[in-house]
Each structure stands twice: as C-alpha cells, then as structure tokens.
Design a protein with these regions (language model features):
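Conserved N-terminal structural module of periplasmic/extracytoplasmic solute-binding proteins
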Residues: 4, 9-11, 22-93, 107, ...
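Extracytoplasmic/periplasmic substrate-recognition and gating elements
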Residues: 47, 51-52, 125, 226-228, ...
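Short helix-initiation/N-cap motifs at beta->coil->alpha
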Residues: 62-70, 89, 154-155, 233-247
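Short helices/loops that flank or line small-molecule/ion binding pockets
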Residues: 68-79, 97, 145, 158-162, ...
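Hinge/lid segment of periplasmic solute-binding proteins
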Residues: 88-138, 148-160, 165, 184, ...
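Short, solvent-exposed loop/beta-turn-alpha elements that line the ligand-binding surface or hinge
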Residues: 105-113, 191-215, 266, 278-287, ...
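Long, aromatic- and glycine/proline-rich binding clefts that accommodate carbohydrate-like moieties
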Residues: 120, 274, 323-372, 379, ...
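Glycine-centered hinge/linker elements that transmit conformational signals in sensory
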Residues: 160, 202-234
Length: 410
C-alpha cells in the first residue's frame, strides 16, 4: 500500500471510558472550524490526535451560527472544512440541502450522551452530528431576597402572590413565548410535532392544542390573571423588563438561561441557580435544549477520519478539559457527576436541567411554529381568548404556513 494512502482505519470502541483503536496512518490534513474563542478548549485533543494519527489538523475559528452559511460557498469550492460546528436548529435545513455527511456511530457510543442532546442531531433516525455543548433555561434567584429556592411552580405562585401584597415580585418568566412555556406544555402532554414512521418528526402532526397543552396554559394563565406578573413583561420587550426588575432587586427569581449569568454578575446580584421547579403533577418542568454539535461536511475528502476526529476529541478527559477552558456545559453523562461540574452551582443546574430538556425540532418547519404559538399564548394568558380556542387557532395557522412553505419548495 502506498505511503500516502490510508493504511488502516478501525472505528473506535469505548472500553472503561478509554478509546481503543489501531493507529491510522494518513497523509494530508483535516480542516476544522471551531466556534469563536473556543479553540483553546480542544488544543490538547488536537495535538494528541495529530500524534496518534499522523495527520495535520488545521483549526480555524468563526462564529458557530455562521459556519453553515460559509460552508455553502467554501464546500463546493474545495476550501471548506472537514469538521464544523453548528446549532441543532440548523440541522434540518443542512440535511435537506445535502451539506452534511451522515455519521456511523454505534448505539453504545451514542448512549454516553444525554438522550436529548444526541437526539438533537438525528433526522429521520439518521445521525449527523455529535453534541459538543448544551444550554437551556434554569431558575435564577436572588439569595439576598429568598434564602432557599422553592421546589414547585405552585409554591412560586403562592410566594409571588404574597410578594405582590408588599409591592414586590416573586418569580418572573416569559410564559407568553413558547420557548419559555414549553417547560409546562411538554411534560403535561403537548408536543410540537409527532413522529413519522422513520422516527423523525412529522410536521403534519402538530400537538400544541392537545388536552395536556391546554391544561398547562390554563395553569400558567393564573400568573397573569391574578397579576402576579406585571403587564410590562408581555410582548417583544418583556425580556428586558424581566432583567431590569431582577437586577433592580425588585424580583426574587426569574426563569432565564446561562446567557444572563454575566449581566447579573455585572449588576452585583448575589444569585443562585437551580433546575426548573416541578409542575402540579409532580413532574419537573422541561425546557428547550439548545445544542452545539460537531458535524462532517459532505465535501470532506476523508469523512471516516473526520468522524474519527470527532469521536477522539469527545473522550471524557478531553471533554473535561474543554469545559474547564470554555465553560460550555458538555452533554456527556459522565460529566454531570464529575466534581468539576457538580461542585459548580451554575454548571450543575444547567447540566441537570439539560438532562430533563427537549431538543428543539431541527426540521425547517419549526420556523413556522414560533409566531402562531406565541400569538396564541399571549391571547390565552391575557384572557383575550379561551386557551383551547387560541391553541386550536395556532395549530391551524401552523399547518397552513407549513403547507405553504412546502408548496413553495416544490
């Protein structure tokens, strides 16, 4: 066999947490696009991979949300990456457009990740990516205003009513947007899309008006009907209003994401972070999971080695190093109980909640859900329309928009 050809490549298996493989002798190089200011997190893994596989890995940084758009141009031109990072909500469009190569990863290797995170990179039961980092909603509370967070959403409602009697606020949340209210709707029986016979999403089956969804919205409605929430947190500027009330120490707690940690720290808030509370039926609130993942370009000249790279850098020791360097929460099951995360209040809360979360559907039709769902929630929660009627209207509107979108793509 010629020196400059691939001599041996055996896909790896994990045993006792270690990667077992025969060395691959490869000519050439791999080009990797990493997220901006995140390449330090994979520096050691890249160096070790280069030594073990006798290949040069070129790492270039760029914002992860822009990588797929750049791939559309650079891939066909032959100057694109072998491996890149994308958010899971871009997966569906990328697969439909033929931009990504499927991965071959046995079930045991998939099972080391939290189910929602690995499922986020499946489309029609085919795997296209390996999860790198997750973010999701958590409950953030001011330790100077409430010593211990409450366990249930009902308890938070009761506490918030008492706070209003004193001119203060208890818990605030943007429940008039599906991104935030999903935490109740999903566990109580609603769903965005049903499944098709391939195990993927069926965009013709919209479940936002099911009895469980109506029950959830009816429960959330009392936060507005009994004026536990101020009117100012409704609508497009509601998130800014919530942040202001929390940083001004007028609200004891908020439901928000890790992106709020730094601004709250800058405002001098002595805050704590915990997973979301439980619902009336005792189930914990869910949340939508945002996942960044490593994928392989369809234009990669060595797709097998590109996948080997992704597997290699996601071994536990490299995942831990990546977390320490970047602070991004990894969805590796073994890391949830690792002291480096478990002893970090913020990281632990995000990790635990991520395991309870639902990956946002990555199909293009998801884009047709947000507007009608949010409009129906605002109508319901403000009492302008009955929850069942509002959610029925949203389901009808979503289906109409999806039908129009699909027709325009034919």
């Amino acid at each position: 066999m010629k020196k400059n050809t691939l001599a041996a490549l055996i896909l790896t298996t994990l045993s006792a947490g270690q990667l077992v493989s025969l060395q691959v002798h490869a000519a050439g190089q791999l080009n990797v696009w990493e997220d901006i200011k995140k390449s330090d997190g994979i520096k050691t893994a890249v160096s070790d991979f280069e030594k073990q596989y006798n290949v040069k890995v070129n790492v270039q940084e760029m914002p992860y949300a822009q990588q797929l758009e750049k791939l559309r141009l650079d891939g066909p031109a032959g100057i694109g990456p072998d491996v890149l990072v994308i958010p899971n909500d871009q997966l569906g469009g990328a697969v439909v457009q033929g931009l990504l190569s499927p991965l071959t990863l046995d079930q045991a290797k998939q099972d080391v990740f939290t189910p929602a995170s690995i499922n986020a990179f499946h489309m029609d039961n085919v795997l296209y990516g390996v999860p790198k980092a997750v973010e999701t909603l958590v409950l953030i509370y001011n330790k100077d205003l409430i010593a211990q967070p409450l366990d249930s959403l009902q308890a938070w409602f009761d506490y918030s009513k008492k706070q209003r009697e004193e001119g203060k606020y208890g818990l605030l949340a943007k429940f008039d947007q599906i991104y935030y209210s999903w935490g109740a709707i999903g566990p109580m029986g609603g769903y965005i899309f049903g499944k098709n016979d391939k195990g993927g999403f069926n965009p013709q089956d919209v479940g936002l008006n099911k009895p469980g969804a109506v029950e959830a919205v009816t429960f959330l409605k009392k936060f507005y009907a009994e004026k536990v929430f101020p009117a100012g947190i409704l609508g497009d500027n509601g998130l800014n209003a919530i942040d202001s009330l929390f940083t001004e120490k007028k609200a004891a707690a908020v439901i928000n994401g890790p992106w709020a940690f730094q601004p709250y720290e800058a405002a001098g808030i002595n805050y704590g972070v915990v997973p979301l509370p439980t619902l009336p039926d005792g189930k914990p609130m869910s949340s939508f999971l945002g996942v960044k993942g490593y994928v392989v370009s369809t234009w990669s000249k060595d797709k097998a080695l590109a996948q080997q790279f992704i597997e290699f850098i996601n071994q536990p020791q490299y995942v831990k190093a990546r977390y320490i360097a970047t602070g991004e929460i990894p969805p590796l099951k073994a890391m949830i109980d690792d002291p480096v995360i478990k002893n970090d209040e913020k990281a632990s809360a995000v990790a635990v909640q991520s395991a309870r979360a639902t990956a946002m559907p990555g199909i293009p039709e998801m884009g047709e859900v947000w507007g009608p769902a949010n409009a129906a929630l605002e109508l319901s929660l403000t009492g302008k329309q009955d929850p069942q009627a509002a959610l029925d209207g949203a389901e009808k509107q979503i289906k109409m928009q999806i039908e129009a979108m699909q027709a325009s793509n034919q």
